[in-house]
Amino acid sequence: MNLNINLLLFLIFCNINFSQNSMNLDILQGIKNPNLVGDTIKLEKNTFNAFNKMQIAAKNDGVDLKIASAHRGYDRQKLIWNTKFKKFTTEFKLKPSQAVYEIIRFSTIPGTSRHHWGTEIDIIDSNYPDEEDVLISKKFEKDGIFFKVKNWLNINSEKFGFYITYNNDPKRKGFEHEPWHYSYAPISKKMLSLFLKSDLKKVIKKEEIKGSEYFTDNFIEKYKKEYILDINKDLK
């Protein structure tokens, strides 16, 4: 009798553990939402609280931080990916394989975006509400409209746990430098560690993702090494 009870408890534990792991992977891949807070801009709760503190500190220094983009689910990332794929292959007449590499200069394959985690934010200056195409690198450089914000973040963001994800280290490969993209390290480092346990091939080799037939084993290995892992060393 005791053996049966112990076996039952073991099976229940295994089932709960499996369900939790599955849920975690679904969150990391953007299929399910993490514990998000916020109105129109949603973030993981610790990230949300840390950003609010940073925003107040910046305001006290005369700098107005605004989040241009935060959490992004799988379906949204898939729409971005497929729209770009269609544009590059029809308007710009790129070969499908070329389109894939053009997209991953700045955009991730659905299921692999750090924005799925709710720990990533794209930051701009709130004083330019009518500005279009805000996520342009030159706008964050000297004489650019977001230089004031960028300069403040360079000095202060790490005090609040935010690190630029794709920095301008000349030795770094993968995604282009994004001066607007910051990650809340205390949570995102844990998220990355969990994400690396997933089967990347199963995550991205889906018919609904345009161009996925070009995701060969060599491509997937390169994507993992250079795009997922070649980030700011302080986020590993």
Which positions does each model-derived feature cover?
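Bacterial Sec-dependent N-terminal signal peptides
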Residues: M1-D26
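Extracytoplasmic cell-surface/polysaccharide-interacting catalytic and binding patches
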Residues: N17-K236
